[in-house]
Amino acid sequence: MKYILVIGDGMADEPVPELGGLTPLEYAKKPFIDELAAKGEVGNVLNVPDNLPAGSDTAIMSIFGCDPNLYYTGRAPLEAAATGIKLNPGDVAYRCNMVTLESGDLPFEEKRILSHSAGSIDGAVSDEIITELFSDPEFAAVAAKAGMTVNLGHSFRHIAVQSQADIKGISLIPPHDHLGEKIGPLLPTGCKNADTLRELMVKANELLERSPINAKLVADGKMPANGIWFWAEGTAVKLPDFVSKNHHTGAVVSAVPLCHGIAALVGLGIVCPEGATGEIDTNYENKMQATLDILEDNDLSLIHISEPTRRTPNSY
């Protein structure tokens, strides 16, 4: 038997008073989904254990048959696996967002976070800025002392790796949950290494405020990427092999590094069709064709649709 599994990431949402208490999914006109529901079997599943934060990382791990309570170490190691980053014992991976902070002469802690994605910065520009930052002698010296390197990611999402880092007790806060707030109470705390991360964030803001690339972004009416933000920390993770466990081969259709990483860790194939962006402008036709093509030689085709999360202001 052939299987197609569709993940509408964030599609369920929550009841909205303006929609008469319905969720966006309940309110939407969706004749094909309604027909499938009427003719098929419908049920409920808890993809995120009650004791863990709800997110694409924990939910998709569950969907792939990996209990987050047993295997989850953080989001960043999953994204790191997408690009083949190998974490050694003692290494810690962080998501390193390019963000937009208030400009001006305010003390660093008094600045507000204006965008967790630097205005959904273009990937090539984001790569150029983060490369410029880690190549700057001042910043490179601080990063080397911290044992930190950076790996280019997708759009505003980069992966930083710190060797021999002790993160016991550390508290790193997701930036997308605190837009418009002063960053002082949101900065890393909880252990000595938190001070190191804060030092890197302060130095990055100081240097990026002077970046000619950011000056051009501002001149073009765009948000500058004048800060970095560490979160989603975690250590190396090993997930059970999907094929050995379920006796089915398959592949994942997605443009999102998180999905690519989980797929790689469980031994499933990865397909990112032309035009698949992980954003609202993605090419659905190519994604669907890729889903069908996978089934020619496999049992399972999993298509991840991340666009519902992009319709919210807090996509991360």
PLM features: residue spans?
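Extreme N-terminal starter segment of soluble prokaryotic enzymes
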Residues: 1-4
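Conserved active-site and cofactor/substrate-binding residues in soluble primary-metabolism enzymes
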Residues: 6, 28-31, 124-128, 195, ...
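Active-site nucleophile/metal-coordination loop of metallo-enzymes that catalyze phosphate/sulfate
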Residues: 12-138
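A residue-level signal for conserved active-site and pocket-lining positions in enzyme catalytic cores
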Residues: 36, 221, 303
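Glycine-rich, mobile lid/loop segments that gate access to catalytic sites or pores
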Residues: 117-227, 233-235
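Long, well-ordered mid-to-C-terminal structural blocks that present hydrophobic/aromatic surfaces
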Residues: 229, 234-302
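Single conserved hydrophobic/aromatic residue that forms the stacking wall/gate
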Residues: 304-316
